[in-house]
Amino acid sequence: GGSTAAGNVTSHAEFNIWADPEAAAFVFDSGISLTMAGLNLTRQVTMGQPEIDTMSASSTPTAAAGAGALDYYSDFSMAHYGVKQSAMHDPCAVLEVVRPELFGRQAMSVNIETAGVHTRGMTVCDQRANAVAPDTDVLVDAASSVVVELIVQAAIDPAS
């Protein structure tokens, strides 16, 4: 969850953080090792009609279900953001654990806004080189085509 820039449920807040900013603040302030796969990253890794068609052509239930979900979300994305693509939010978070080399990261100090009238639920990411106590590895880029290929392949052949 989170974002170094714009949100998706408000102009500044990403849904998961916005839904319970106090809990998110507790986690981000806990001192445990954190990696954030925010909207700034996941919006770089998208699937469109070619990937949906590839998955639809597969005979596996996983690919069929994935294609249906992607088709629905692509329509939603078109209606709300003007882009007929699906951002790969959760798959990026999972793939970072199993294939971390596919992602670039930057250490940042991340705080959660819990009181702002217009910014409640915002992840405040200090991207300055001299940031005080960077405490979170924030994913900033991805080998997008490789990530998308791995997701499609996993849907077509879940044993791969």
What is each of the regions a protein language model found here?
Residues 18, 22, 37-160:
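Conformational coupling and interaction surfaces
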